[in-house]
C-alpha cells in the first residue's frame, strides 16, 4: 500500500477550477493531491522577431514557485537574479508541449503567454502545470474566437501529463507525490495527446536501471492516468471540449484525403 493508501495505478484527487482569476484570457487553479498550480494564458499582439511577417503565432511559458510552496522556504529567483536550470527546462517543456496540439497559423501574429505558478508543491509540479495550462489555453482561445481576435478554432487535440515511477518495494506506480518521488528507483514524466501519442518522455534511473518490460509497464500506467486527466479537462471545459474534438476530426479527415 502506498503512503496515502492509493492503489499503484491510482491518481491523486483532481480539481480543476476554471476562470480562477479575473484579468487573464484563460485561467485555472488545478489541484492534484496537495500540488496546486495557478495556470494562466494571456494574448499579446506580437510575436518573437524570428516569426515577424510570417502570419503565424507562438506559445511560450514561464514557470515559478512561491517561496513557501515547499516545506522549507525557497528564495525567489528574482531575488537571486538568476533563473535556475530546472525552471528553464520546465518552461521550455510546457511551451513545447502546448505547441504540439495547436495550429499556430490560426492564431495570427500573436503570442500566447502561459504562466504556471506553483502555490503548493507535493510532486508532479511540471506535469500538473502542463495539464492545467492546456485548460487555460483552451479558455483563452474560446475568448479570442468569441471576440473576433481569431477566426477559426486552433486546438486540435487534448494534452495532459503525469508522472510514473518504480518504487523499490511496490514496483510501478502512477502519479508520484514528493515522498514517493524521493525514494523511487526510476521516475518518468510523460506528456501525451488525446490520441495517445507521446509529446515528451523524461525518464531516469536513480542509482538504478530499468528493463524494457518495466518501461512498457510504466508507460501503460501513464496512458491510463492521462486518459483520466483528459476526462477531467473535458468536464472542466464543458462545451469548449467539443471544439477540440471537432478540430481533431477535421484534421484527421484532411490527412486521409
UniProtKB/Swiss-Prot annotation:
Homohexameric ring arranged as a trimer of dimers. Phosphorolytic 3'-5' exoribonuclease that plays an important role in tRNA 3'-end maturation. Removes nucleotide residues following the 3'-CCA terminus of tRNAs; can also add nucleotides to the ends of RNA molecules by using nucleoside diphosphates as substrates, but this may not be physiologically important. Probably plays a role in initiation of 16S rRNA degradation (leading to ribosome degradation) during starvation. It comes from Halalkalibacterium halodurans (strain ATCC BAA-125 / DSM 18197 / FERM 7344 / JCM 9153 / C-125) (Bacillus halodurans). It holds the Pfam family RNase_PH_C. The lineage of its organism: Bacteria, Bacillati, Bacillota, Bacilli, Bacillales. InterPro entries: ExoRNase_PH_dom1 (IPR001247), ExoRNase_PH_dom2 (IPR015847), ExoRNase_PH_dom2_sf (IPR036345), PNPase/RNase_PH_dom_sf (IPR027408), Ribosomal_Su5_D2-typ_SF (IPR020568), RNase_PH (IPR050080), RNase_PH_bac-type (IPR002381), RNase_PH_CS (IPR018336). One of its GO terms (molecular function) is tRNA binding. Disulfide bonds: none annotated. Keywords: Nucleotidyltransferase, RNA-binding, rRNA processing, Transferase, tRNA processing, tRNA-binding. It is an enzyme of class 2 (transferase). SUPFAM superfamilies: Ribonuclease PH domain 2-like, Ribosomal protein S5 domain 2-like. Phosphate binds at residues 86, 124-126. Belongs to the RNase PH family. It catalyses: tRNA(n+1) + phosphate = tRNA(n) + a ribonucleoside 5'-diphosphate. This is Ribonuclease PH. CDD domains: RNase_PH_bact. GO terms for biological process: rRNA catabolic process; rRNA processing; tRNA processing. Its EC number is 2.7.7.56.
Amino acid at each position: 500500500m502506498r503512503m496515502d493508501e492509493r492503489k499503484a495505478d491510482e491518481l491523486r484527487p483532481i480539481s480543476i477550477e476554471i476562470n480562477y482569476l479575473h484579468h487573464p484570457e484563460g485561467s485555472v487553479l488545478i489541484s492534484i493531491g496537495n500540488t496546486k498550480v495557478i495556470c494562466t494564458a494571456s494574448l499579446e499582439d506580437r510575436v518573437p522577431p524570428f516569426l515577424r511577417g510570417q502570419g503565424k503565432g507562438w506559445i511560450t511559458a514561464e514557470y515559478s514557485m512561491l517561496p513557501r510552496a515547499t516545506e522549507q522556504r525557497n528564495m525567489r529567483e528574482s531575488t537571486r537574479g538568476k533563473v535556475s536550470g530546472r525552471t528553464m527546462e520546465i518552461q521550455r517543456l510546457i511551451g513545447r508541449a502546448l505547441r504540439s496540439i495547436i495550429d499556430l497559423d490560426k492564431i495570427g501574429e500573436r503570442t500566447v503567454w502561459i504562466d504556471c505558478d506553483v502555490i503548493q508543491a507535493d510532486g508532479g509540479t511540471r506535469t500538473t502545470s502542463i495539464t492545467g495550462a492546456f485548460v487555460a489555453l483552451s479558455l483563452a482561445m474560446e475568448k479570442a474566437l468569441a471576440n473576433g481576435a481569431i477566426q477559426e478554432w486552433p486546438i486540435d487535440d487534448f494534452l495532459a501529463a503525469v508522472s510514473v515511477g518504480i518504487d523499490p518495494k511496490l514496483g510501478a506506480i502512477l502519479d508520484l507525490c514528493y515522498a514517493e518521488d524521493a525514494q523511487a528507483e526510476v521516475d518518468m514524466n510523460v506528456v501525451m495527446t488525446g490520441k495517445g501519442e507521446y509529446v515528451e518522455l523524461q525518464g531516469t534511473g536513480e542509482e538504478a536501471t530499468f528493463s524494457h518490460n518495466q518501461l512498457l509497464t510504466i508507460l501503460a500506467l501513464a496512458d491510463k492516468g492521462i486518459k483520466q486527466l483528459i476526462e477531467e479537462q473535458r468536464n472542466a471545459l464543458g462545451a469548449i471540449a467539443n471544439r477540440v474534438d471537432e478540430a481533431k476530426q477535421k484534421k484527421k479527415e484532411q490527412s486521409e484525403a
